[in-house]
Structure formats: C-alpha cells, structure tokens
Curated annotation (Swiss-Prot):
This is Claspin. A motif (PCNA-interacting protein (PIP)) lies at residues 311-318. GO terms for molecular function: anaphase-promoting complex binding; DNA secondary structure binding. Keywords: Acetylation, Cell cycle, Coiled coil, DNA damage, DNA repair, DNA-binding, Nucleus, Phosphoprotein, Repeat, Ubl conjugation. The modification Phosphoserine is found at residues 26, 42, 46, 53, 65, 67, 83, 110, 113, 225, 260, 516, 718, 720, 723, 731, 744, 762, 808, 810, 833, 839, 846, 950, 954, 958, 1012, 1018, 1020, 1156, 1289. The keyword DNA-binding applies. Phosphorylated. Undergoes ATR-dependent phosphorylation by CHEK1 during activation of DNA replication or damage checkpoints. Phosphorylation by CSNK1G1/CK1 promotes CHEK1 binding. Phosphorylated by CDC7 during DNA replication, phosphorylation inhibits interaction between the acidic patch and N-terminal segments leading to increased binding to DNA and PCNA. Ubiquitinated by the anaphase promoting complex/cyclosome (APC/C) during G1 phase, leading to its degradation by the proteasome. Ubiquitination is mediated via its interaction with FZR1/CDH1. Following DNA damage, it is deubiquitinated by USP28 in G2 phase, preventing its degradation. The gene is CLSPN. Changing H439R: In a breast cancer sample; somatic mutation. The modification N6-acetyllysine is found at K891. Residues 72-82, 385-394, 423-438, 764-774, 947-961 have a biased composition (Polar residues). Belongs to the claspin family. The C-terminus of the protein contains 3 potential CHEK1-binding motifs (CKB motifs). Potential phosphorylation sites within CKB motif 1 and CKB motif 2 are required for interaction with CHEK1. The acidic patch region is required for normal DNA replication. Interacts with the N-terminal segments and inhibits binding to DNA and PCNA. Mediates the interaction with the kinase CDC7 as well as some replisome factors and DNA polymerases.
Amino acid sequence: MTGEVGSEVHLEINDPNVISQEEADSPSDSGQGSYETIGPLSEGDSDEEIFVSKKLKNRKVLQDSDSETEDTNASPEKTTYDSAEEENKENLYAGKNTKIKRIYKTVADSDESYMEKSLYQENLEAQVKPCLELSLQSGNSTDFTTDRKSSKKHIHDKEGTAGKAKVKSKRRLEKEERKMEKIRQLKKKETKNQEDDVEQPFNDSGCLLVDKDLFETGLEDENNSPLEDEESLESIRAAVKNKVKKHKKKEPSLESGVHSFEEGSELSKGTTRKERKAARLSKEALKQLHSETQRLIRESALNLPYHMPENKTIHDFFKRKPRPTCHGNAMALLKSSKYQSSHHKEIIDTANTTEMNSDHHSKGSEQTTGAENEVETNALPVVSKETQIITGSDESCRKDLVKNEELEIQEKQKQSDIRPSPGDSSVLQQESNFLGNNHSEECQVGGLVAFEPHALEGEGPQNPEETDEKVEEPEQQNKSSAVGPPEKVRRFTLDRLKQLGVDVSIKPRLGADEDSFVILEPETNRELEALKQRFWKHANPAAKPRAGQTVNVNVIVKDMGTDGKEELKADVVPVTLAPKKLDGASHTKPGEKLQVLKAKLQEAMKLRRFEERQKRQALFKLDNEDGFEEEEEEEEEMTDESEEDGEEKVEKEEKEEELEEEEEKEEEEEEEGNQETAEFLLSSEEIETKDEKEMDKENNDGSSEIGKAVGFLSVPKSLSSDSTLLLFKDSSSKMGYFPTEEKSETDENSGKQPSKLDEDDSCSLLTKESSHNSSFELIGSTIPSYQPCNRQTGRGTSFFPTAGGFRSPSPGLFRASLVSSASKSSGKLSEPSLPIEDSQDLYNASPEPKTLFLGAGDFQFCLEDDTQSQLLDADGFLNVRNHRNQYQALKPRLPLASMDENAMDANMDELLDLCTGKFTSQAEKHLPRKSDKKENMEELLNLCSGKFTSQDASTPASSELNKQEKESSMGDPMEEALALCSGSFPTDKEEEDEEEEFGDFRLVSNDNEFDSDEDEHSDSGNDLALEDHEDDDEEELLKRSEKLKRQMRLRKYLEDEAEVSGSDVGSEDEYDGEEIDEYEEDVIDEVLPSDEELQSQIKKIHMKTMLDDDKRQLRLYQERYLADGDLHSDGPGRMRKFRWKNIDDASQMDLFHRDSDDDQTEEQLDESEARWRKERIEREQWLRDMAQQGKITAEEEEEIGEDSQFMILAKKVTAKALQKNASRPMVIQESKSLLRNPFEAIRPGSAQQVKTGSLLNQPKAVLQKLAALSDHNPSAPRNSRNFVFHTLSPVKAEAAKESSKSQVKKRGPSFMTSPSPKHLKTDDSTSGLTRSIFKYLES
C-alpha cells in the first residue's frame, strides 16, 4: 500500500527530486507495507527502511551485534524521517493529497533554493537530533533488549550530532552526517541481517495497520513530532534538501535493490537523507496533526468505558487495563511500533523536560516556533501554515495524548503490578494494543530518550544514568512483569509518571472506587438502621413460646362404689398443656405444623399403645388362660395366611401406599384438625413397634389405598394391614365392608394381636373371647386360616397400621361401619390376639376404651366380653357384646361382598362369614345393639369428623354411633342403600330425619353405609348377615330380611342409577362422610375455583337471573297493560304475527287458534285478543293463587336439583304419597279456584287484579313462577325470551286445547262455589306442579 501510495504521490508530483524521494521512500514504506518485502533496499534507504520495519517490529527484532545497533542508531535518523515522510505522504495522500503535493513542492523548492539549505541544514541538525532520537528510539527499541551499550554508543554519536544541530552550523551537520554514515556502515552489515530477519517477517505479518493509507496511526508522526517540537522547521527544510539529494542518488540503488550503502555513498546519502528527513519532517508536521487527531479519536474510542473492541471473558475485563509488555503477537507489535512514535514524542518530551537542561527544553519550544516560522518562509507558505497548524495541534494533541497515556500508564502500572505475568501483559496488549504499544514503545524509547536528551544537550551519561535509576525504580516495582523490556517500559513509564507528579505509590485494585459509580439512592445510615432494629426488638419482643405446663383439671368421674353402685366423684386430672409456639416462629415450612403434630401424636400413641398393651396383656392372661393355646395355633395359621396374602399384596400395597401417602398427606393437610390427630394416632400406633410400625404403615397405606380403590375391601395386601382389616371389625368397618360378625371377629383378632401377647396369649385371648362369644370361639378355631393380620403388626402396630391405612383412604368411609365394627371389636377386645389392635382401637376407641386405642383402662376392659361389660359399665360404656350384636346384625351383608372384592376366594366368603360373625348370634347376644350403635356411632362421628382422638374420645363417639345405629337399625338397609346410591352419607340425625321423611328410604348411617357397601359387594354377605341375625334375634332377622329385600331391590335400582349417573364413583370418597363434613371446605377449595372466581361467577349468574326476572316482569307487565299489538312494538317488524307463528301450540298464543297466524289481520285477531285477555286474566289469577304452592314445590325441586338421584327419587316417592292423600281435595279446590278466577278475570279484569293485588305487589319468586308458567310449553325453556323457538307437535297442542276446553266446560259451573285461592294455597304443595292449569283456561 505504501509503495502504491508513493507511486500515486509521484504521479501527482512531477518534481524529479520528489519522485526520487518517493521512489526511495516507496520501498522503505513497503517495509511497513503489508504486501511488499523489505528485503533488498537501497543503501541509503535500506537503513532507514530497516529501522522503519524495526520500529514496527521493535519487540521482535533481535540485535545480532552491537554494530548492528550502531547502524540502526545511525540510520534511524534518516529512517525515521524517511518513514515519517512516507507515512506523511501516505497519510496525506489518503486524507490530504493537496498537502502532500505542497509538501513535495516544498521539498523540491528546498532542494532548488540552496540558500535555504543552510537553514534546512540547521533545521536538519535540529531535527537530526529528533531523527537520531527517533532512529535511536527505533533502533534502540529494536535493539533495546539485546544491547543497551550499543544504544549508548549511538546516543553518544547522536549527542555530538545534536550539539552540532544546536549550533545550527553546517559544519556540525556535516560532521554529524559523517558520524552517522560511519554508524550506518557499521549498521549496514547488521541491517542486511535484520532485513532478512525483520523486514520480511514484518511484511508477512500482513497487518493492515502497517498500511498507512488505510490506517493513519500517526505513531511515527508522533515519534517525529516531539523532535519537531524540539527542533524548528528550519532543520526540517534542511533535511528536506539533503533528502532530496539523497533520493536522487538513491534512486538507482533503490530500483536495483542492491544495498550499496556500505560502498561509500553513505556520506552523500547522509546529506540526502537529512534533506529527505527534513522534507519528511515537514510532511510529518502536516501528517502528525491528522494522525494524532485520528490517534486521539482512536484513543478516546479505546478509553471509552463503553467501547468493547471484542467479546471478552470476565478475566479479560479484569486484565484490560495493564499495558502489554514488549512481547506480543504481530498485530500488537505492529500497533505498538506504529503508536510508538506518539509515545516516543511523549517520552522525549517528558525526558527532555526532566533530564534535559532548560536550554534543551527551551530549544524544543524554539524549534517548534522556529519550525513554524521557517515553514512560513518556505516557498509554499501554505505548507508552512499547515505545518504550523499541525505542529501546534500536534503539540496540543501530544499534550492530550501524553496526559491520556500517563493516565493509561498509571493504570497500566497498577494493573501490571497486579498482574505482572507476561501472559496478562500480552492479553492486555491485545485488549489495549494502542495504549500498551505506546507504552512499550515509550519504554523502548525511554532509554533512548533519556540518552538522547543528554546526548543532544551534551549533559553526559549522567542524565541517562538518572533515567536508568528512575527506570530501575519502576523496574523494581514492575518486576512482576515477566520480561526485561516491559520492565524498562514500566520503569520509564513510572519515571515519567513521577516526573509528571503522578503518585506511583497508589496500588491498583480490581474493586471500583466509591466515586466510580453514581448512586442515586441516598446512602443508608447503617447505624440508624441497626438502632431501628434494636428498638423494634425492644418494642416488639418476640413472644416466647409457652413451655409445656401441667394443669390440674377438676373432673367428675363416674365410679363404681364398693356396693356396686355408680357414683359421681370429683377427681383431679393433671393435664399437660402442649408448649404453645408462635405461629410464625416455630412453623416456617408449609407442612411443618402438621408434621410436628404427627410426630407428637405418634409419640403419644406409642405411649398409649404400650400402656394399653400391657393392660390388655394382663387382662388376656387373666381371662384367656385356657384359650390361649388353641387361639395361638389359630392365630399362627391366620398370621401365616395373612403373611402370605400380605406378602403377595405387599408390593401392590407399597405402590399403593406411595400414592396413598401422598393422598394422606393431602388429606392430612386438609384435615389438619381432628383428622390429622386421628391419622397421627393411627400412624403412631403403626409406629409403636418399629418393625410393626413399618409393616403397619405399609399395610395401612396399602389397605387404605386398596380400600379406596376397591371400595374399602379389606384384602390383606400387607400381612398386617389385610389381616387387621379382616380380623378386626374396626378395620373392616373402616373399610366399610366387614359384616358385623366379621368385624367382631376381626376386632377380637385385632385385640389379640394389638395386645402383642405371645401367640399363646393372643390365642388364649381369642379362645376366651370366643368362649364368651361362641361366634368368636368358632372364629378362633375355624377362621384363623384366614386372618392375614400379621401378629407382628397386630400385636404392636397392626391395629393402628390398619387404622392408618384406613384413615388415609377416607375417614368417612369408616363412619358407620367402622364405628359399628370398632364398637363390636372393642366389645370383643378379648380378641386382642388379632394383630389389628391398633386399627381396632382407633375405630372402636369411642365405643370401648378397652379397644386398643382406648386408654390403658379401656384396653383392659376390652379383653373379654365379660370384662368388657364390667369395664364398660365402670367406664360408662355399654357392653361390647351388645355392640357386637347390633353390629353383627348390620354387618352380615357387607362382609361377603367386601371379602370378594378383596380378592377373597369363594371359600373366603364362608371364612368371612365365620370371621365376621356368622357366629354372630353369640356376639350379638352378648352385645346389645344399643351399645353397638352407641359405640359405633361415636366412632363414626370421630372418624367422620376426622377426629381420631384418644381411644377414650373415640369410645364415646362409637357408643353414640351405636345408639344412632340402634335408632336407625330399622331403616339401616334402606338408609345404606340410599346413602350409597345417592353417594351422600348423611349424619345419623340426617338419616333419622330422612327416615322419618321418606319412611323406608332412610339414608343409612355411616356404619350402615359401609354395611350397605358390603351388601352391594355381595348379596351373599347380606344373606349371611341375615343368617347371623337369625342366630342372634330371629325377629330382628325377619325384620331385617324384609328390609334387606327392599334394600336390595332399592339398592339394585340405586346402584344401576348410580352407575348411570356416576354417583357411585364418588361413593368411596363419600365414605369419609362425617369426616368430610369437617374438612369439606378444604376439599371444596381444592375442587372449586378461587373465591374471586366464584364471586364473579355468582355475580354473573345473579345478574343473568336478575335480567331474566326483569325481562319476565316486563313481559308480564306488557301482556297485562299493553295492547296485544304493542307487546313487541319495541322491535321493528316484531309484530304479534311473528310472535304467534313461533310460539308453540301449547304456548300462550295457542290459546288463540293456530289459524290466527294467517287470520291475524281478520276477525280471529279480535277473537284471539279477547280470548287471550280472558285467559291471561284467568291464568294470572290462578298463578297468584298457586304461586305459593308452586313456588314451594318448585323450590323443593330446585333444591333437590340434580345433585342426587336418590333425593329426586325420594322426593318423587314422598310426592306421590302426598298426592294420593291430598290430590283429590287439592285438585277440586284448585279447579274451583281456577275456574272462579278465570271468570272473575274475564268480567272485571282490572277489579280482579286489584283484589288479588297487582303483579307489582307479587314477590320476585312469584313473578318468576308466573313468567315460567306463562310459557305453556312445559318442555320449553323457562326463559320466556326463548319462547319463539318452542316447538310442540300440533297434534298434541290441539289435543291439549280440546282437553282443556272440555275440562273447563265440565268444571265451569263450580267456579263460583270454589273457595278463594288464598285459603287453598296450603292444601297442595306438590300437585300444583304435576297438574296443568291451562286445561281450565279455555272454555
């Protein structure tokens, strides 16, 4: 590029001298050019070109010898000037061709006008110094790493030359040139080597920055600029003349490419070079301004904080500021060499200012001013002006650059101190190539500058020494930098910074200063904030959690006196209040409170179970001494079977347990109240024995999951859980499928196992219980084969495990059945040998504290029926035997089906019958149904409410449930069927109320619900239950069988309906029944949308209904008060004709003849209008009369809605029954009132309205009914606005007309005698809906 530029400039400039210069320069520039090789340069230019290339490749140039350095130092004068000239030419050509031409003209004139040669030579001397300096800078920068001594020699030579320049005498200049020629001769040898080593590799670098046309770096301009400042333009002109001469001589040598520099032309070349350098300096003066301005622009761009030359890593950003060391890649070296000139200028300025005498410093200013003046005296004053401007601007630019560079050097030093590694410096070189290269060049030039000033000033090496010392100090500081040249660079930089007054002691740091960021927010006063916090703590002291307290509570206890009478005694019970923790403090996690509650419950249950087991074991030992051996064997068989079954189902249960555990967690969170407690009790019982707990948890989870999935089938999915479910009536009741007998057996078994007596003890207990209850004895002997409850689980945790399993399925499922089973099992806690004691106790706890869950005292009583009866009396509970009897009657139907669903074999049904109390006759005899119901109801209440409270609490609940069961025992089958079919498991009160309301259709209590579930599962189970009832009470069995038959029929019907409606699907969840009631809101919250959404929906619905009501009212008012034609006048084209067409035959318009559509404009219209008014009056009157009745019935229907088919069915049944009783008188009265009203309406329509009150006075509900009734099509939508689309078959409409006419005619005579509708309202609440009034409307 430079060569091309030179040629182009040559074309522009016709002066042969200039051409020769250009030609000579073009190769030299080519040294910097990317495409030309610097290889064989002419003698004169070869040195300069070499040094130019060396400048660019300062860092990589290796000095072969001191002589080479000398040559390098000698030639750099010319080299600097030549390169600067060429650079200026190129830059000016690229940006300022006119200036280049002027410069060349000036050079030519300087050649021609030899008179100015003296001035030029003087200026040359002045600028030979800068040239020497630049050459030394370039040469030393090149050879700096290799030899400082050689640089010193060059400096001394240059010092002599500089002194001559100061004198501004030609003689000195010539001597200087001679010396330089000598140096060049020595250098020439090195130059050749360097040309081979440096020039071509430099060209190979292909750096575009070398191309000055493309990149006007102004680096070399800057190198010369300080010299220019130091030396006037006169020297530049002299140098231009010499260089022009030089180029003339050089042209052939350059063209030939032969280096004849050694051959003696060096002297003349020196002069020529001086001239060239002077001319080049004059060009550089112009070029510097441009290049430095561009450099300033580049620097500003580089230094801009937001300028990011390339994507860098965070490490690069950290390393950004440090200046590159002399080592670097080709690009970095090229840039550094280019930017070196500016740094050289700055360094020379600083070094001269500090090290040079004031003479030299003033001399630089004189040079600058003189250069400006001499430029003015040039043949081309324009060029001189430009140079003046350039030099002045260059100085200013240099000052700015010096400042910027100094700042950058400081930062670089800081960062270099931080990161002394050369790798970092290289990275920094890449990042801040310009700054880094400048500094490296500064460093390289540093020594040169330090020497040059003192050479120029003749100060001797003291200044260089000082400079060296100064450099050494920064070197020590910058020892971290890996390479010597960088150290020197840093030395010089630090030296310069010190000279500039910069505090070098400041250590760099990665963190930004406080002032580096603009913080708009006011500074926070930390002390004040801390004070506020302390004050807040004092003002609002954290409420300390209340420690656990023991409070004595006065309790009235029923106690048995020594004489056997019950007495109420005052007792003091110590109650330990749980430590009260702050809500926010202790419970930070979502489920933490629940977990803590669970843990506490488990601990409490462990203690309670342990105590109860001990009591039970003692009771078992006392009561079941004889029976333990037999029952132990039976229990072993049962446990084996249960284990086998459990093992088979353990895997399934484990999977199900995982799901159930999640469900349980959700349920527990929902039920966090009582249900959580109950679940925790169950879980705690499960946990009592770790092994048992684990098994129980698995079993319970599996069983509960299975129960949910299978409808609470108590399949022994896990050894303990299945066995507990089947063996323990409580578990079966929880599952909701065990018959009462089966439940009692399971309860006995559960009692045996929970007691955790040895198998002998548990067996003996079973045998004893069975002896007390023959059914249980049979169970012990025959059923043990199927009692999958694991003894391990049963003894320690089986009962609770099952309870835990069951609780998770859905506590409501176990309401009635669980209560009944629990009560039975509790009644027969003598069964403790069964492993399900925990589940048994959980569900039977309320009926009998003796059950496993009951307190220790309760458990003691549960051991045997006899002991239980006594204990129950002492505790105030009914005998467990009675509970069992009640339960056994209820349960027989459920167990079979449940067992079948539980994957029981066909033989298992028999086993279930036996286990469930097909031997229930004895159990039932022992346990009156009343106690059963009480206990079961209590248990159910507890379970349903989600309260798995202490066994004591569960016991009263079960007893209450037993009472309820007894009360509802008559309607149990129907209630169960209804409840199951409808999917609603109402409370016992609801059941009783429904029983009263619906008679046979009673909603079964939860126990009965489970029984009904069992019945649903298998009719055979019901039959077995019936058989058991026969054993217990044949009368009761007969009653039950009848009820069961009805129930089964009803159940089949309801089941079919449920299957169709899908209500059966939710039955399992609905088994939760009463428990669901407790946390029903939570469940609803899960299903329903948010309150806002609900509110918005309700508002929409309300507004819609209001709008419909308004529309209905408006239509009624229109019909009443507006003429027939005006009714739809609001819509254009919406004539009565249209209305008549689209209305059904049974609609209001049907009152008018269908033909009225065609004849509306004719006479029929009048007739129809009259008839319409008449009918409307009659209809309104009748509606007023029937508004209340219709309203009531409609509201009932609406209330029933589509929620449950069972409710609809029950309503229908009751409605039919009521209609049978009251339909005739109601019909008569209605007809009378209707007939009366129409006639009255016809004659005095307005008077009639006044009598009955206007529609405005009617309540909104009545108006709605009226609007609905006004639509005669019963199948049509209620909204009158849709009447247009009602369709009735014309035949039906006609038939309806005829029938209505005939009926009206028949009953016409009785109009006057009918009582007023007001009195008739109360008579009929249902028939009004079923009967159509419109048959009376047409006469």
